[in-house]
Amino acid sequence: MKGNHLGEFEEIVLLTVAILYDEAYGVAVREEIERRMDRKVSLGAMHATLVRLEEKGLLRSRLGEATSKRGGKRKRHFQVTRIGQEALRATRAVREDLWRDVPGAAFN
């Protein structure tokens, strides 16, 4: 892995893949992010991020069964790897440390 630093969108994608678990494929991940974050995501950005996270070893994928509903096309399902889980935990720890160190008066 090229370090365990995640960009904001990478973190969101990894967390969403974990949330969707067995239903984590490109379009579903994109729709879930758009719904939860009220933020539009292009299919190209989604695909590029999923590929990049898989190349980094943070995700793994498998092809699902072909269905007539999709014209025989198979969905590529994603799963967070152990390395991906570790990267998410490290990112969470950094964020929690930062929040813990913000003085109460900073937001008054």
Residue ranges of predicted features:
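Alpha-helical residues within the helix-turn-helix
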Residues: 31, 54-55
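Basic amphipathic alpha-helical segments that dock to polyanions
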Residues: 46-53
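Beta-hairpin "wing" of winged helix-turn-helix
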Residues: 56-71
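Exposed loop/turn and edge beta-strand positions of beta-sandwich/beta-sheet ligand-binding modules
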Residues: 74
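Amphipathic alpha-helical dimerization/coiled-coil segments
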Residues: 83-108
